[in-house]
């Protein structure tokens, strides 16, 4: 009887350890990476959050984003080339429209950046810088963060394609998310 209890405790400990290891792996894998590398991606999502004091409705405006070619260097052991113009471009703005009967403490909208694999001439990792464009909406603060975005260009039988995009803020992988 004691042996059965010990076996159950050991099994429970092993299962707990396995769950902890698998959960740790999930947090690493949940990094802000778009694409699986095997298929071409066409867009990179960008999120905009407007925080309020809870007494203001969503602003009736949109927020746009800017993309600039980044410089050469290294990222995660890969040689990185400067971005190629047109490989990553601002596409859809994050649009807000007042609605509802109760103001919220924050409002979130999504925009996107367009990916164009046809502009690349060789496989590799390409670097871009993404920022929020400052606007003139009265009383609005704009996020001055800069994200490094790395596009991974692969070669297949059908030619070059962008299979992954990784966004980084202050040296850490992070979703492309701007907050006022």
Language-model features: where?
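Solvent-exposed loop/turn and edge beta-strand elements of beta-rich ligand-binding domains
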Residues: 2-180
């Amino acid at each position: 009887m004691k042996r059965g209890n010990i076996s159950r405790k050991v099994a429970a400990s092993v299962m707990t350890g396995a769950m902890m290891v698998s959960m740790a792996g999930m947090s690493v894998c949940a990094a802000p990476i778009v694409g699986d590398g095997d298929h071409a991606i066409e867009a990179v999502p960008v999120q905009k959050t407007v925080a309020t004091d809870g007494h203001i409705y969503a602003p009736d405006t949109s927020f746009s984003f800017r993309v600039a070619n980044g410089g050469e260097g290294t990222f995660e052991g890969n040689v990185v080339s400067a971005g190629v113009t047109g490989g990553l471009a601002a596409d859809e703005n994050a649009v807000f429209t007042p609605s509802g009967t109760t103001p919220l403490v924050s409002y979130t909208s999504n925009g996107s950046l367009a990916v164009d694999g046809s502009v690349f001439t060789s496989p590799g990792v390409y670097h871009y810088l993404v920022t929020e464009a400052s606007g003139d909406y009265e009383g609005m603060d704009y996020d001055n963060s800069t994200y490094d975005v790395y596009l991974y260009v692969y070669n297949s039988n059908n030619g070059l394609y962008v299979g992954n995009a990784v966004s980084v803020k202050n040296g850490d992988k992070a979703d492309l998310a701007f907050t006022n």
